[in-house]
Amino acid sequence: MIFGHGIDLQEISAVKKAYDRNPRFAKKVLTPKEWERFESLSGERQMSFLAGRWAGKEAFSKAWGTGIGAVGFKDIEILNNDKGAPVVTQSPFEGNVFISISHSGDFVQASVILEKTKR
């Protein structure tokens, strides 16, 4: 049964401005494993990755029904599987989490569906 669905859209240039003002911003959003991946990238790819993780976590918090605050950025971890697709590997939700992150030009869109599992 679907518990919630959240969508978020981020402008990569706005995320870059926030990062340029305060590079520690990325460490507030990313878990240690996400940070490792971020550090392995460079330039525009770094900002695209950061914006994608931000959008994914915002979308999760909307699906969860709270928004960021009741659930923190570091409570949610989004890594890539062996095919490169994003997967939520850590979250407060007990059930299935489906995530999609899409990049187009200066924008990143994320969609998260939370599905309760039957017990």
UniProtKB/Swiss-Prot annotation:
It catalyses: apo-[ACP] + CoA = holo-[ACP] + adenosine 3',5'-bisphosphate + H(+). It comes from the Bacteria. Its cofactor is Mg(2+). Signal peptide: none annotated. One of its GO terms (biological process) is fatty acid biosynthetic process. The keyword Lyase does not apply. Its main location: cytoplasm. One of its GO terms (molecular function) is holo-[acyl-carrier-protein] synthase activity. Mg(2+) binds at residues 8, 58. Keywords: Cytoplasm, Fatty acid biosynthesis, Fatty acid metabolism, Lipid biosynthesis, Lipid metabolism, Magnesium, Metal-binding, Transferase. Its EC number is 2.7.8.7. The keyword Lipid metabolism applies. Disulfide bonds: none annotated. It holds the Pfam family ACPS. It is found in: Cytoplasm. InterPro entries: 4-PPantetheinyl_Trfase_dom, 4-PPantetheinyl_Trfase_dom_sf, ACPS, Ppantetheine-prot_Trfase_dom. It is an enzyme of class 2 (transferase). GO terms for cellular component: cytoplasm. Transfers the 4'-phosphopantetheine moiety from coenzyme A to a Ser of acyl-carrier-protein. Belongs to the P-Pant transferase superfamily. AcpS family. This is Holo-[acyl-carrier-protein] synthase. It comes from Streptococcus thermophilus (strain ATCC BAA-250 / LMG 18311). The gene is acpS.
